[in-house]
Each structure stands twice: as structure tokens, then as C-alpha cells.
Amino acid sequence: MRKKLLCVVLLSLCLLLAGCGQKVEPVSIDGTEYNPRSTTEVTMVVTEETLPLLDELPALESADLSGSLCLPAIQAWAEAHPQVAVRYTVPLRDDLVVPNDTVSLDLSGVPREELPEALLMLPYLPALQEVELGRLEDGSAASVLADQDPGLRVSYTPTWRGQTLDLNMSALDLSQVTVGDARALLSWLPMMQNLRTVSLGSGSAETPPVSWDMLAEMQAAAPQAEFSYAFTLYGKELTLQDTALDLNHIRIGDQGALVKAITACMPQLRYLDMDFCGVDDEYMAEIRDNLPNCEVVWRIWFGTGYTCRTDEVRILASNPGIGGELSPDNTGPLKYCTKVKYLDLGHNSYLGNLDFCNYMPDLESLVIALSNVHDLSPLANCPHLHYAELQTSALNDLRPLANCTELTDLNICYNFSLTDITPLYGLTSLSRLWIGCLTPIPTAQVEEIKSLLPNCTVNTKDLDPTREEWRWDGEYDNGMLKPSAGYEQLRINMEYDRAPFSYSYIRNDPLYAPHGQGDNTTPPDWFMNQEAIPYDYSIPE
């Protein structure tokens, strides 16, 4: 046993002695050879290609890489090799190169135009604690440093218009500033946290002290401050603090560009009326979208003679003989009427879709009887729909109505392509379902819905969609017909007593009297003399 152990020890010693005799291959970096076992310090200029060769020097303890320009790669290598003391230099400009262990830095002598480039190099100085910038004419340099390293102590003297600027001031007068002054101040505003009031004096909307776009930038830079400016716009005296702006029936010729710029600077604005201003719908929509906290109202046109304001809650346009036939080509503007609750577009046989209903989330009553509508998909976005007269149309799919869980009254008579009412099975609020005798719903489905909705009256016998109890429920004592509860509410909501077929026609607009030639039956001359009215007055083929 002892003899075997002795043999093992002798064999191990032989192997060690054999290894000691092997030659160590040097590491060559830029023509200089380094012993990987004994090299602990190096001084060299490296590139991104040669820097990885330092990994082949496992005994390395210190590396002076001053003069090297691949700073991102050097910084990453140093972080990956914390056991090596890495030294390098950072060129801030041609005549200013500092070591990476710099703690304090004075950049006051750097030309202002070169300062931004110098600041970009500071992240390569991990030991840096304080920086002196000297006199600054704008705050961009200080902002850059604050964003790069919030813990860095930065000293500077802010100047504006040749004078030292007090960043702690609470009030500022800009009534006499130039565009250049405003641009320079813009960079300082985020640092003026105590600023509370900024006055721009008074003047016109067309010639403010600074451009409206610039003013909007300044307001965004100092949101805690109130900017004041009294100005005249289209003959109206206004201020930036106004909460309402009424421009209705004022002809505006720039598609609302000036109004859009001004209202963006009115943070308290909650109501803007631009009825009959001649601005196209798409431009008005841009103004509306630019003011999320403000109700923006304008006039839209649809059909060939219908019109209404976008804040209208009820629209009645069921007289093609006056307002023209409604069709997919001339009803698009209705999408801007996002507050509509009550909508009657019946008797329009060319009406083929309801795309505009996608934008009517508050819709409660809908009448599209005697139309060509076949797709109810937009109604899936109308969860508050209560009353729907869909009879005598081209329906073939009721699935979108499954989302209308508040639906109480539904008339689907005279829809010859409709064969499935299963989407209605979950409408537990439904109290009246008029199918009539001509809509081909399977008997089994009729019996099933009666079972599922025992409180719902289901009519499958009447030929006339509006006969019997759908609209009239007996007579009053004086012999007058008594409307059913659902229809009576519809009449109230739609204000049928005001106009039985249409009050969306142009001649019924009450605004014509104060702004026209003295009566409500003729549009004012300035409207009739417009070069172009963007509406198709031809009847669809």
C-alpha cells in the first residue's frame, strides 16, 4: 500500500516539473508583448478592437488608458473588471482634457457655443461632484446637467436681456419682449418654480408680444404660473383667463387656425361656440381634439338641406321632400354630434348604414324605419339605447343589440332577411318586442324568448308595424288616441309636437332671425353668397 502511494506522489511531482518547463505565450497589443502571468500594470492607448485583449492579462491590477477615445467601451470594460484600477482622460474640448477621477470642474471659460458638446462628455467622469458654468444666457446647459445627474452640484449665473436673472422671482412682465427674448427665457422658465404671474399686457390677437405657439410653450414650461394677456379677436374683448368664447355667426376665413392657436393658450376655457363660422368639419374637429377640457360646438350639414349644432341632443330628419334623401355619402358629419340622445332618421330609403352612431354613446332613442340599413354594428357602442324602431329596413343580424342591455322597446317588423333573435335572449329589460307576422323568425325562438323574458310583450301577429299597442293604447275620455307608454316617451324626447317630420332643416334654425335679414324662412345673404357649400345637393341614384 505504501509503495503505491509513493508512486502516485512521484508521478504528480513529475507532471508539475514538466509543466514548469512549458513556454508562456505573450499577449501582443499594438506591437507590444505582455506576459499574461506577470503583467500587473499597463499604460497604452486602446481602441474598441484592442481593448478586449486586456482580458488576456489575468494578473492586471492597473490600466492607464489616457488618450484613448473609445470612452463608452472603456467605461463598460472598467465596470466589468472592478479589480482593475482604470484611468483614462476625457476630452471636453481641444485644449481641455481632464482625468476620469476629476471631482470638481470649471467650465466657465468654455465658449457658450461649445458648451453643449462639452456637457455631453461629463457622464464619463464618474467621480464628478460639482461643476461651475459661469454666466449663462439660457438655461439649456443647466437643464442638461440636471437631467444627466440630479445629484451633481451645478453653479452658474443666469442672465437674460443682458442682466442677471432672479430665478426666484414671483412676477414677470413680458409686455415689451422680442421673439429672441422670449426664446431665451423659455429655457429658464422650468427653473423658476416660484413664478406665479406673467403679464403680456394687451393688444390684438393678430399681433401678440410673442407668437401664440411660443406662448403655449412658455405656459407648458411654467404650468404653475398664470399668464395674462388682454386682446381683441374678431371684435370681441377677451383675456387668457376667459372660460367661454362665443364666435357664432362670425365668418372665419383661415379654417380656424388663429382660433386654434389662441384657445390652446386659454387654460380655463370650457366652452367654445363656432356655430356658422364657415370652418370645415375636419378643422373644427382638430380644434375640439386640441381642447380636451372644453366643449367645442359648431354647425354640421347633412343630407341636402339638413343642419344642426354639434351639441344637439335630438335630431329629427325624416322628411326627404324637404331635407333631401339621407345616404351614406351625406350623413358622415353626424359623427360630430357626440351628445345625441334622440335620433329619428326614418323614411330615408337610401340610408344604408349607421356609422355615425359609433360616436353617439349616449343614444337612447333611435328611429330608422323605412330605411335600407342592414348593419347594426355601430349600435354596439350605444349601451344606453332604450327605444328602437328598426322596422321595414334591411336587417339581417341582431348581434350588435346584445350590448344594448337597457333596451326596453324594439320593433323589427317587416325585416324579411332577419331569421334569428337569439342575440336578444339576454336583454332582461326588454318590455316590448314587435316582430309582426312577416319577419321570418322561427316559432321555436319566439317561444324561447317568451320563456326567457316573461315580462316582455312579444307581438307576432300584426301586419302593420305600428298598429295596436305599439303606438296607441286605447283612447282618452275625450276620444283622442292614447299613446302607449314607450311611444309617449318617444314623442316627448323627440319633441314631435314641435315639428312632426323635421326640425333640422335650415329654415327652422332660430339663429337666422338675429343674424339674417329679419325672418326665419330665408338664410342670410352672406351664407347664400358663399363661393362653395361643401354639401352634395343631388339626390342619390
Q: Residue locations for each model-derived region?
A:
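Bacterial lipoprotein signal-peptidase II cleavage site
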Residues: 21-26
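C-terminal motif of bacterial Sec signal peptides marking the signal peptidase cleavage site
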Residues: 16-19
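Positively charged n-region of N-terminal signal peptides that target proteins for export
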Residues: 1-5, 10
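Concave beta-strand-loop units of leucine-rich repeat
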Residues: 38-50, 59-72, 81-95, 100-121, ...
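Short, solvent-exposed mixed-charge patches
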Residues: 539-541
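Histidine-anchored nucleotide/phosphate-binding helix
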Residues: 54, 122, 189
